């Protein structure tokens, strides 16, 4: 069964985007998952992922935007529980592509770790770059079973700072921390995670997330209410047990007939109905119904009277 994060990424890889915005997405994918090597005295670009749908998207975006032919390779893992690695390899026009995406400088050697201002200055390009960044290094917890958490991993501190800046452009309150010789941008608020999914175009995943969140929050509210009512019920039971204990003490020590008429009346009624509420006791008073506060006052008097006699005996 596919994880929730896999469902999000699958939806993102199926989005159709304008070529200009696709460049921003491709820039993130290559900057975060790409590596350069020398082959026959020229640079070769390898973009690696464990997700075949992401590999196909990188291949398609390169072809659509630069009319270049790249290779799609599969590196099979022999160890158990290890996913295959999918590699998009570009052997020709590598510098042209990387320079256009502002990933390397014109000298072909200097790597730009920051996001170019022409992306950061335009909302739709920012959305596309964040989509690529999530596809390349993002994960999100299953909202049904885990605490709310979404993160994007980046190797470079400057790049991480730009991701935080771009996310907070949409009021997402993104935070950052250091992890595994890299940097993490993360969200922990359910509402902000849903907003981010909307920002990067994962509308269906966002709607599913919101549905789960509503049910989960409702379930938590019901549990809190039940716990509160259980606590109140336990208090009521304990109070009734204490009242009966004190009334029985008064009956056995001084006799209920020796109590004032109003106290005797409520004492006899409580002994007859040990489990009913104060409101119900008030409705059953032989001399006429009285309020819950009136019943509570009389029972408190009986408790004080019993405790007073007990102290005298001690």
UniProtKB/Swiss-Prot annotation:
GO BP of this protein: cell division; regulation of sporulation
Highest taxon listed in the record's lineage: Bacteria
Signal peptide start and end residues: none
Keyword Cell cycle: yes
Stored InterPro entries: Homing_endonucl, Intein_endonuc_central, Sporu_reg_WhiA_N_dom, Sporulation_regulator_WhiA, Sporulation_regulator_WhiA_C, WhiA_LAGLIDADG_dom
Keywords for the protein's UniProt record, in alphabetical order: Cell cycle, Cell division, DNA-binding
Family statement drawn from the similarity comment of this UniProt entry: Belongs to the WhiA family.
UniProt-recorded name of the protein: Probable cell division protein WhiA
Organism: Latilactobacillus sakei subsp. sakei (strain 23K) (Lactobacillus sakei subsp. sakei)
